[in-house]
Amino acid sequence: MFIDEDYVNIVPQDLLERGIRLREEYGIYDIAWRFDDVMEVLKIAKSKDMVIVGGDVYRLSGNKPIITYDSWSIKEGDDGDDAFELAVRYITNYRARNGDDFAYCPAIGPYTILQEPNEQTEK
């Protein structure tokens, strides 16, 4: 999985700056984004053949993230397109039910993480 430092090479600087870093608050080397920004991050990840294997939701108090313990994840056998659609659907539904005071931290990695270990070495 990518960590916060990896996003420098993935998303534009302005999008990176709007992200909420989780390192200081929770010791997690990752970034959460508000709804519109996370949707952009997901589109960028898909366009770069990356996969979203799941993610976590944080409630925002001001700009401070608070763990909700809500999350989503793909199932064994899901492909990259399924993972993207699941993330979009989960986040969109979560926002519709709970409002805008949330940030979403997608777990993004290279597409190869969906392959079996022997498939990765055969290439």
Language-model regions, residue ranges each:
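Structured alpha/beta or helical-core interaction and ligand-binding surfaces enriched in interleaved
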Residues: G27-I28, A32-V41, G77
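Short, solvent-exposed polar/charged micro-motifs at secondary-structure junctions
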Residues: F35-E40, G62-Y69, Y111-T121
